[in-house]
Amino acid sequence: MSTKTIYDRLRRYGLTAERACGLMGNFQAESAMRSNNVEDRSGMDDDRYTALADSGNYDFLTDYGKHYGYGLAQWTLASRKENLLNTAKKRGVSVSDEAMQVDFAVWEISNQWPKLWELLTTSHDLYECTRQVCLDYERPAVNNIDARYRAAQDFFEQLAGGSDPDPQPAPDPQPSPPERGDPIVRVLQTCMAYDGYWPADQIDGIKTPEYREAIVKYAADVAGC
């Protein structure tokens, strides 16, 4: 699937040109627009990893506790990878199928991030679109929004034929920490990406079983579960 095909598919969902390109700019930063891309720290070949995931003989959901990002959006949380894999199975396609992944990303945003989805379908601010996808949907450990925005600009020029609507974007604010009452899935995503938001006495090691248990306990408390 070409970048033009991905762009057209996103536009058919009602995304503005700026929002489609903002989302694609994030995909470019996450995976270089490769739907079979597995996170580099896995040390695994993309095709080999995908074949294992499709075979059912590999722990695709958690990567045996190592939690590798995968696909266009580098889905990492077990719950999200499970939904991605189930969607692929229902369609009878590989988990690397580009059309399926685009549809899945749209489904996630429209159902789990309704405010972001509203922005996706109404905003004509390319920088804001790119920034909000990064902060709300992707939540990377390193924001690198400038690189995402440059990629979004390139897509906008190539696919929408427009000029940069915001050539001098304002400095990017840091995303806010989780707040009491937030949905637990959002708290979990924030905690997984930004260790700095954790109370010091609740961090015990890095990505250990105790650490993951602390994440769930802390997120449940903040979400009021």
Regions found by a protein language model. Name each.
Residues 175-186, 190-225:
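Short acidic, glycine/serine/threonine-rich helix-capping segments at coil-helix boundaries
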Residues 14-24, 35-42, 115-125, 129, ...:
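Surface-exposed patches in mature extracellular/periplasmic domains of secreted proteins
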Residues 3-7, 20-24, 72, 99-102, ...:
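Extracytoplasmic/secreted envelope proteins and their assembly/folding machinery
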Residues 81-177:
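Non-catalytic cell-wall polysaccharide-engagement segments
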Residues 1-33:
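Export/targeting segments at the very N-terminus of extracytoplasmic proteins
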Residues 5, 31-121:
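Peptidoglycan-targeting cell-wall enzymes and recognition modules
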Residues 3, 16-20, 65-68, 94-102, ...:
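Solvent-exposed, acidic/flexible segments
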Residues 27-31, 75-76, 120-143, 206-221:
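Acidic helix/loop microenvironments that form the catalytic cleft of cell-wall polysaccharide enzymes
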